[in-house]
From Swiss-Prot:
Its EC number is 2.4.1.-. Keywords: Carbohydrate metabolism, Fucose metabolism, Glycoprotein, Glycosyltransferase, Membrane, Signal-anchor, Transferase, Transmembrane, Transmembrane helix. One of its GO terms (biological process) is fucose metabolic process. This is O-fucosyltransferase 30. It is a single-pass type II membrane protein. The keyword Nucleotide-binding does not apply. One of its GO terms (cellular component) is endosome. The gene is OFUT30. Belongs to the glycosyltransferase GT106 family. It comes from Arabidopsis thaliana (Mouse-ear cress).
């Protein structure tokens, strides 16, 4: 005892004495630690086994978590309408094909389509459906939302309806639509003047409201009762059909092979599901004000479709025919026809040569071979000078050493025409599109006079879209000597569609 209270005196046996005094404390602390660790382990095991919905927004009141879901907004501000939102990706041609699919889905499900902006080329990438390597629907939705807000902040927002003419669709009541900017203003409670200017500072209340809206519409926090239903099925699991007479839920013919399953550790099984039975009348999704898809891209693949197989359904034949070809707005078509008549001034061949991007850069020779064969055939039929309009991603200063370089030197037999990035008429066409502001003319929810004024003053297009590409496609639609496109290019498919519907003569 004296040793314990008198530290100045050395203790011959300090450790045994110390242990006697601390045994009870050590046992107590050890017991508490074990209990804490035990409860932590139990919590995480329990958490991992609980249904995700318990920790998602759907487990709570949407109006508490998201003010945008208050009943007065859904019933009064949005007039009780049901909306469809989706997440486009990649270049313009892919975005256009998704837009057409979105129009069909909106028509089938009787929802108002939220018209998206035209995204920067490859600003949002989906991935590869055939390889079962894609972004999840919630990931691509939040990417598209963020990029859309970035376009607004940087004054580069152009609506799909500013470029593509949907006036006949809307006037015939085939579909209902609303501009993304106006919808975001109503849903998120952000004034149009603030939304459409570069004053959208990241620390502002408006920016925070939009950020919260993004979380809501992306579905990253789950569904919200009567407000949002986020579709999580994508091309890895689902092929959407519509009243085609087949059994709902049957296996699709295209499935991942065993090698891919093993390599990617896949357990996905692709099933064909009727979109109306799954998301239409009488379903959980029907009650939600907003139905949010991910990507709506599809393409034929190995005897099936990657994601959407509704285009041959007899029930929507009329709508499919109306959506099949959506022409450019008149300003673009006039510019293309004017270039053909006033600059080329002769019958011409159009060559669309995609040489730099993605897989196409590895197939230059085969791309050039198609053009060579077409020109050889034309030379036999039409001896003399052949005019060729070239639309390509290969800059002119890189033509040396390529077939294009050889053609440009052969001025006796060929005359090449192309649109330069600095051509004056591009800026003129952009200005005309800005003035027209076609995207503001459509909306299922009437605008107040104040909103109309703000849209016209602050939300007009700002030339951020690739007007050159659209005009080049319009020029190619007028090529009387034919068209040579790059195999596998969606741009080539778009030009072929324009030529099929005689866009040049009918515009």
């Amino acid at each position: 005892m004296n040793n314990f209270f008198n530290p100045s005196r050395p203790s011959p046996r300090p450790w045994p004495n110390r242990k006697k005094q601390t045994d009870k404390s050590a046992i107590f602390l050890c017991s508490v630690s074990i209990l804490v660790v035990f409860f932590i382990v139990v919590f995480f095991i329990t958490y991992s086994e609980m249904p995700k919905s318990l920790f998602s927004i759907s487990a709570f009141s949407g109006s508490v978590q998201f003010p945008q879901c208050r009943s007065e907004i859904l019933t009064r501000t949005l007039l009780g309408q049901k909306f469809l939102w989706y997440a486009p990706h990649s270049g313009f041609s892919n975005q256009l094909s998704e837009f057409k699919n979105a129009l069909l889905m909106a028509g089938i499900l009787n929802r108002t389509l939220i018209i998206p902006p035209i995204l920067d080329h490859h600003a949002v990438a989906l991935g590869s459906c055939p390889k079962f390597r894609v972004l999840s629907p919630s990931e691509i939705r939040i990417s598209v939302w963020n990029h859309s807000i970035e376009l607004l902040k940087t004054d580069r927002y152009v609506s799909m309806a500013d470029i593509v003419d949907i006036s006949s669709l809307v006037s015939s009541s085939a579909v209902r639509v609303i501009d993304f900017r106006y919808f975001a203003s109503l849903q998120c409670g952000v004034d149009l003047e603030t939304l459409c200017t570069d004053d959208l500072a990241e620390q502002s209340q408006a920016y925070e409201s939009l950020k919260q809206c993004g979380y809501l519409l992306s579905g990253v926090r789950g569904n919200v009762d009567k407000c949002l239903y986020a579709v999580d099925e994508d091309c890895r699991t689902t092929v959407w059909t519509y009243k085609n007479g087949e059994a709902d839920g049957r296996l699709d013919s295209f499935q991942p092979d065993e090698k891919l399953k093993k390599k990617k550790k896949l357990s996905n099984v692709r099933r064909r599901r009727d979109v109306y039975k799954t998301l239409g009348h009488g379903t959980e999704a029907e009650s939600a004000a907003i139905l949010a898809f991910g990507s709506l891209f599809t393409a034929p693949y190995k005897g099936s479709e990657l994601y959407i197989d509704i285009h041959k359904s007899p029930k929507i034949k009329s709508l499919v025919e109306k959506v099949d070809f959506l022409p450019f707005v008149r300003e673009i078509m006039i510019a293309g026809k004017k270039f053909a008549s006033e600059t080329i001034k002769a019958p011409f061949l159009c060559a669309q040569l995609r040489l730099l991007d993605g897989q196409f850069k590895n197939h230059r020779e085969s791309t050039f071979t198609g053009l060579y064969q077409k020109l050889e055939a034309l030379s036999v039929k039409n001896p003399g000078l052949i005019n060729v309009f070239v639309m390509t991603d290969l800059p002119e200063f890189n033509w040396t050493g390529t077939y294009l370089g050889d053609l440009s030197k052969n001025s006796t037999n060929f005359k090449l025409h192309f649109i330069g990035e600095q051509d004056e008429f591009l800026a003129r066409t952009e200005h005309e599109l800005d003035s027209a502001s076609h995207g503001q003319k459509f909306g299922s929810i009437p605008m107040s006079l104040d909103s109309i004024k703000k849209m016209q003053t602050h939300c007009y297009p700002h030339g951020g879209s690739n007007v050159q590409l659209y005009i080049e496609e319009a020029v190619c639609s007028c090529a009387s000597l034919g068209f040579v496109g790059t195999p596998g290019s969606t741009i080539a498919d778009s030009v072929e569609m324009m030529r099929k519907y005689n866009a040049c003569s009918s515009s």
